[in-house]
Amino acid sequence: MNLTELKNTPVSELITLGENMGLENLARMRKQDIIFAILKQHAKSGEDIFGDGVLEILQDGFGFLRSADSSYLAGPDDIYVSPSQIRRFNLRTGDTISGKIRPPKEGERYFALLKVNEVNFDKPENARNKILFENLTPLHANSRLRMERGNGSTEDLTARVLDLASPIGRGQRGLIVAPPKAGKTMLLQNIAQSIAYNHPDCVLMVLLIDERPEEVTEMQRLVKGEVVASTFDEPASRHVQVAEMVIEKAKRLVEHKKDVIILLDSITRLARAYNTVVPASGKVLTGGVDANALHRPKRFFGAARNVEEGGSLTIIATALIDTGSKMDEVIYEEFKGTGNMELHLSRKIAEKRVFPAIDYNRSGTRKEELLTTQEELQKMWILRKIIHPMGEIDAMEFLINKLAMTKTNDDFFEMMKRS
């Protein structure tokens, strides 16, 4: 029996399964407690139980395997990992571990890990001699992540504008600068769907911080990938813990030469959470930001890199501006020069209900010549020269109308050449 499979089973089926095993009063219990009771009953019959999760090591030296389904929140069905196992396999926070588990003995509260079968989807022996993330060599992004799907749909228009305005590569550190109601969540969903469609080999993680619960549900249903969220009714410490778990997991996967993509909504809210959590240093910047508060969100954002030894970590984060809060302006100013790709959304364009509301002239990618062919780069530059004198709304309307006539960007450039 597998713990993860039970977590994905609907509650009604779990109750039926439990009643068939002779358990009572399940209807009044929480889902995690029902799973706990079923597994305890199952283990009494002497059969094996398997479980997996992402390791979080606590200060006392032991750790727990947390589940991504509950957004790495501590719960009764977490799996205890002993300090000796952590030392033996050289495990770190963020390692994805699967193995055989046993039910709690008398006086214990958690399931315990008996045997490690896999570390980060690899044999445990291979995990011992990997290079630490901090020691890997960072490079410019040089392998393109294409967003265009080529199916001619209206969603694909957004992806195509994105490919023209600011191409994204593996290892990009991108910032989407957005005022409220400019369609940033829709844009992120679009990017997520394009990545799942065009690059199924990449590990996609969507991290929603301080978000509305209904948007979390929508994202989980639309995105083929891991959606980890902490809603606005949870404390700041919880936002911070979720973000730390996601970035640590991503780093461990990059050490195993995987390409990981994190879509973060939003870095402003994450920085606000760190500002609440961090101990007061006595120095306060404009807008009430503590002088030490922005170091950790910068470490999160700065982890994005293309790695020479193989693998990459791409982070596309949204930053909020024009919210009327001085703190948000300060946070944006701090992150402004750190990314190597910027996409600006415009409130004016969105108010006219023209989507995607991208401010084409202000958006762009550094070192874009590494991501595109020389011929494509020339065409993109010519397009910029045509669009530059127009106003931001006219530019976007012109581009969308022209793109709608063709199915792919190559066709669009051909049409441009002829005219």
From Swiss-Prot:
Protein residues bound to ATP: 169-174, 181-186, 212
Domain of life: Bacteria
First-level EC class: hydrolase
Activity regulation as described: ATPase activity is inhibited by bicyclomycin and dihydrobicyclomycin.
Quaternary assembly: Homohexamer. The homohexamer assembles into an open ring structure.
UniProt note: domains: Each subunit has two RNA-binding sites, one at the surface of the hexameric ring, and one at the center of the open ring structure, where RNA helicase activity is thought to take place.
Protein name, entry field: Transcription termination factor Rho
Organism: Escherichia coli (strain K12)
